[in-house]
């Protein structure tokens, strides 16, 4: 009796997971092989894990600096907040813009730094 690949697959499909695991172990022992997926060897670790470029940035006001009034005006212009909200944000510091493009983040940072603020882009 000749076993075809199809018959072998059908026989394996009828087995439980534990029985299949025992079968795999027996095949590994018999033929001296491993059922582990082959690992590709790369030239460098950096090439193996490509770095994703950040696309969304957060602009955070760290410090208002000496020109507080100018910074409040800049915060209002950038965020669209009212005078009181802009003043509170300027005094406390915090996130000005979230999930903005790199260009937008750099523009906001430039405007606020021109007004005298310390700004961080993450």
From Swiss-Prot:
InterPro entries: Ribosomal_bL12 (IPR000206), Ribosomal_bL12_C (IPR013823), Ribosomal_bL12_C/ClpS-like (IPR014719), Ribosomal_bL12_oligo (IPR008932), Ribosomal_bL12_oligo_N_sf (IPR036235). One of its GO terms (molecular function) is mRNA binding. GO terms for biological process: translation. Pfam families: Ribosomal_L12, Ribosomal_L12_N. It comes from the Bacteria. The keyword Ribosomal protein applies. Gene3D superfamilies: 3.30.1390.10, Single helix bin. GO terms for cellular component: cytosolic large ribosomal subunit. Keywords: Ribonucleoprotein, Ribosomal protein. The keyword Ribosomal protein applies. Homodimer. Part of the ribosomal stalk of the 50S ribosomal subunit. Forms a multimeric L10(L12)X complex, where L10 forms an elongated spine to which 2 to 4 L12 dimers bind in a sequential fashion. Binds GTP-bound translation factors. Belongs to the bacterial ribosomal protein bL12 family. Forms part of the ribosomal stalk which helps the ribosome interact with GTP-bound translation factors. Is thus essential for accurate translation. PANTHER family: 39S RIBOSOMAL PROTEIN L12, LARGE RIBOSOMAL SUBUNIT PROTEIN BL12M. This is Large ribosomal subunit protein bL12. The gene is rplL.
């Amino acid at each position: 009796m000749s076993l075809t690949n199809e018959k072998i697959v059908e026989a394996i499909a009828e087995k439980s997971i534990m029985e299949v695991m025992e079968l795999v172990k027996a095949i590994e022992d018999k033929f001296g092989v491993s059922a582990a997926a082959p690992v590709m060897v790369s030239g460098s670790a950096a090439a193996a894990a490509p770095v994703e470029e950040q696309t969304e940035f957060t602009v955070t006001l760290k410090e208002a600096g000496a020109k507080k009034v100018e910074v409040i005006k800049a915060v209002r212009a950038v965020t669209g907040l009212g005078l009181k909200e802009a003043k509170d944000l300027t005094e406390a510091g915090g996130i000005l813009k979230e999930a903005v493009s790199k260009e937008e983040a750099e523009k906001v940072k430039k405007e606020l730094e021109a007004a005298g603020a310390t700004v961080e882009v993450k």
